[in-house]
Structure formats: C-alpha cells, structure tokens
C-alpha cells in the first residue's frame, strides 16, 4: 500500500525530470561536437567526435567573447546580491519584530511592488539613470537590480524571521544587549539558511536577466553574458556548436551555485510559504 502511494508521484517526477534532461543533453552533446556532425543530427552517435574547440572559440570570440560576458555578469550579479540582502534583512527584521503605526500598510505596499511588471518602470528608470549619468554603466544596472530585489527579499526574510523563536532574543535583552547586537550576533546566525537561500535566488535572477541589461547597457564592451549569447548565432548561418558551448558556460554558474547550496532549498521554500 505504501509503495503504491508513492509510485505515481515518483513516476510523474521522473517523467518531468527526463523531459527536462533530454533537451539539456542535446545542448551538451552539440557543444562538444564539430559543426559537420551537428547539422546531420545531434542524436546521431556515429561518428561522435569530442572536441573543446567550440568552448575555446566561444571564450575568445573576435566580436563578443563570452569570457568577457561572464566577467561582466559577475561584476553585476555579486553586488546586486549582497547589497539588497543586507538592506532587506534589516527592514525585514523590523517588520517581524517591531510595531509602528503604518507597519501593515507599508508591508502591503511592499507586497504590491512584487507584482509590478518590469516593463512599467523601465522608461522612467531609463530617464532617471540618464539624468544621473548612470546609463550604460555597471553601477546603474546594479542599483536597478538591487532596488528591484528589495521587495521580494523583505517579504522572504520577514517570513523567515517570524519563524525564529524569540526566547534567545529576550534573554539577550535582559542581559543588556542592544537591538543591533541581538540582530547581528543572534538573529543573523540563526537565519543563515534563509539568508543564503535568498542570496541564491537573487543571484540566479540577476545572472539570468536579459531585459534590464538590454535596456541599460548599450556599450558592446559592457555586455553581460545573456546579451552576448544571441549575438553569437552568426549573420549568415548559425554555428550551433559555438552557441551551445556558450550556453553551457552561462548555465554552469547558477547550476554550480545551486549544487553547492542545495540543502538550503527547503529553508527557502518554508520562508516563502509560512506567514506569521
């Protein structure tokens, strides 16, 4: 009876996993094969020649080297993750632990911001960055990503802080600890899984972004990895080996991040779903 209970969900999960894995395997196989073999069908295993030439050509592309794009993506993604997580954690702790007159209205406004489409804000943001001389700069894009991530990280961390027991904090107050000392030395270590989970999600979102980078970065030398990918397709024909190799390298960074911190996924799911 117990086996039957889990059989159907497991079959569904495995079916979905295989459906996602087959296209990825196709991309991976195309990235390590010569162009002549790819155009005959990536699923044909004879002949099957393994080469790293596609990766080398993608990294050292004469016009849009993906290596420079990966570096630019890291320059944008790392501060765009650290800054909003720090600021949002402070605000989230205030929402979770303190009472002030407009607390509920302000939090409702933050939740409303999460539903705001990027397309509605891109025009005023464009003129704002242009007037501040931040258009076409990494700093401008970092500010936009950081501001855009604040709302959901506040919501995420507020729920996570609300789950934490308050006994240790109350004991620290009795011992004379200040609010900041309690937050820095007690709450943050307890909330480390939630902080890392929020950081992973924010980093992955910034790394995968194409729309904001396309609007605010116009200098080809500053293009991030997601901007360079479609430019590698060629003008007269598509070099599938080059394009798939670049795609694998761009995908590899968030995949590695998820693989290293996968044990925090459960905490992240709880942080989103539980509200106190």
Swiss-Prot record:
CC per GO annotation: plasma membrane
Swiss-Prot/TrEMBL keywords: Cell membrane, Membrane, Transmembrane, Transmembrane helix, Transport
Matching CDD domains: TM_PBP2 (cd06261)
Pfam families recorded: BPD_transp_1
Any one GO BP annotation for this protein: transmembrane transport
Superkingdom per UniProt: Archaea
Membrane topology of this protein: Multi-pass membrane protein
Alphabetical list of SUPFAM superfamilies matching this protein: MetI-like (SSF161098)
Localization terms from the record: Cell membrane
Endoplasmic reticulum as UniProt keyword: no
Positions of transmembrane segments: 12-32, 75-95, 109-129, 137-157, 186-206, 241-261
UniProt similarity note: Belongs to the binding-protein-dependent transport system permease family. MalFG subfamily.
Function of the protein: Probably part of a binding-protein-dependent transport system PH1036/38/39. Probably responsible for the translocation of the substrate across the membrane.
Protein name: Probable ABC transporter permease protein PH1036
Source organism of this protein record: Pyrococcus horikoshii (strain ATCC 700860 / DSM 12428 / JCM 9974 / NBRC 100139 / OT-3)
């Amino acid at each position: 009876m117990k086996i039957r209970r889990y059989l159907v969900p497991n079959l569904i999960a495995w079916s979905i996993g295989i459906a996602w894995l087959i296209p990825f395997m196709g991309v991976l196989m195309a990235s390590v094969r010569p162009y002549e073999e790819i155009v005959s069908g990536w699923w044909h295993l004879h002949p099957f020649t393994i080469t790293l030439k596609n990766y080398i050509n993608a990294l050292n592309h004469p016009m849009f080297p993906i290596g420079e794009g990966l570096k630019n993506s890291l320059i944008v993604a790392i501060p765009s993750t650290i800054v909003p997580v720090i600021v949002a954690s402070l605000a989230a702790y205030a929402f979770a632990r303190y009472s002030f007159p407009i607390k509920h209205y302000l939090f409702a406004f933050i939740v409303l911001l999460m539903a705001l489409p990027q397309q509605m804000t891109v025009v005023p943001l464009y003129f704002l960055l242009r007037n501040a001389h931040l258009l076409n700069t990494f700093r401008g894009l970092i500010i936009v990503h950081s501001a855009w991530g604040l709302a959901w990280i506040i919501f995420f961390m507020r729920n996570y802080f609300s789950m934490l027991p308050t006994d240790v904090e109350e004991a620290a107050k009795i011992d004379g600890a200040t609010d900041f000392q309690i937050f820095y030395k007690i709450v943050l270590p307890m909330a480390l899984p939630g902080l890392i989970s929020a950081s992973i999600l924010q980093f992955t979102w910034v790394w995968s972004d194409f729309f904001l980078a396309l609007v605010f970065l116009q200098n080809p030398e500053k293009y991030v990895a997601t901007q360079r990918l479609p430019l590698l397709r060629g003008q007269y024909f598509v070099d599938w080996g080059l394009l798939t190799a670049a795609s694998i390298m761009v995908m590899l960074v968030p995949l590695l991040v998820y693989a290293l911190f996968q044990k925090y996924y459960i905490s992240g799911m709880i942080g989103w779903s539980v509200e106190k």
